[in-house]
Amino acid sequence: MAKTDKVTAVAEITEQFKDSTATVITEYRGLSVSALATLRRSLGASATYAVAKNTLVKRAAADAGVEGLDELFAGPTAIAFIKGEPVDAAKAIKTFAKDNKALIIKGGYMDGRALSVAEVERIADLESREVLLAKLAGAMKGNLNKAAGLFAAPASQVARLAAALQEKKAGEESAA
């Protein structure tokens, strides 16, 4: 690879690091080209799956301010640059790795810190953003109904107490 090509490649990878919300680093040793194409299709438009030389990726990561990943860049390495929600892409990679034992998840990077394999898998096990928002809305609605009941209870108790006192007074006046 010519020096100008390397400089261009490092610049492109640096931009991908900067533009992505998360990255997942994998080892693809033993995967066929068609299997890699299947993985790329399963990631969809929200992620780019790229194979690059480790030295270029290390340099690009340093240029992008991404730290703590150098030990992951050994052997045949491919990176999923995720733009948008990391859950769906991590889930697709985890599912693909389960079906294709040749793909090994090495780790990742999100929110300014390196992720272990277990953390990447935990992200993959999360439900999608829409499902989590729906659950949150349901919980909030239920809690609002409970809160409304709590706030209404003292007022209704005062009203019942006033009605009981009025009945008691009316009963005392009629008895006298």
Swiss-Prot record:
One of its GO terms (biological process) is translation. InterPro entries: Ribosomal_uL10, Ribosomal_uL10-like_sf, Ribosomal_uL10_bac, Ribosomal_uL10_bac_type, Ribosomal_uL10_CS_bac. It comes from the Bacteria. GO terms for cellular component: large ribosomal subunit. The keyword Phosphoprotein does not apply. Transmembrane segments: none annotated. Keywords: Ribonucleoprotein, Ribosomal protein, RNA-binding, rRNA-binding. Pfam families: Ribosomal_L10 (PF00466). Forms part of the ribosomal stalk, playing a central role in the interaction of the ribosome with GTP-bound translation factors. Part of the ribosomal stalk of the 50S ribosomal subunit. The N-terminus interacts with L11 and the large rRNA to form the base of the stalk. The C-terminus forms an elongated spine to which L12 dimers bind in a sequential fashion forming a multimeric L10(L12)X complex. Belongs to the universal ribosomal protein uL10 family. NCBIfam families: PRK00099.1-1. This is Large ribosomal subunit protein uL10. It comes from Mycobacteroides abscessus (strain ATCC 19977 / DSM 44196 / CCUG 20993 / CIP 104536 / JCM 13569 / NCTC 13031 / TMC 1543 / L948).
